[in-house]
Amino acid sequence: MAKQKIRIRLKAYEHRILDQSADKIVETAKRTGAQISGPIPLPTERTIYTVIRSPHKFKKSREQFEMRTHKRLIDIVDPTPKTVDSLMKLDLPSGVDIEIKL
């Protein structure tokens, strides 16, 4: 029988909140007896918006805004039913996007 694996991808704009959430997931999975790989930092996605400062004139005067999306990857190898239940009950901050694949 092939080993079952749960892959969790986390995304957030704040890296501190993201790391705290990843630590909670790793701690919960280790406590329930599953093997963990990660958290693996993935490349940070940068989105830059350039806006003209003036409403009418002076096109050369511009302002740039940047939005960074930080990402982490956690693999849970051979999870137990207790691991899955505890991960479902886990309370994470609202600023973290979670994508789970079985």
Curated annotation (Swiss-Prot):
A Pfam family annotated for this UniProt entry: Ribosomal_S10
Keywords: Ribonucleoprotein, Ribosomal protein
Source superkingdom: Bacteria
InterPro entries: Ribosomal_uS10, Ribosomal_uS10_CS, Ribosomal_uS10_dom, Ribosomal_uS10_dom_sf
MF term (GO), any: structural constituent of ribosome
BP GO terms, sorted: translation
Protein function: Involved in the binding of tRNA to the ribosomes.
Family matches, as HAMAP family: Ribosomal_uS10 (MF_00508)
Full protein name: Small ribosomal subunit protein uS10
Taxonomic path: Bacteria, Bacillati, Bacillota, Bacilli, Lactobacillales
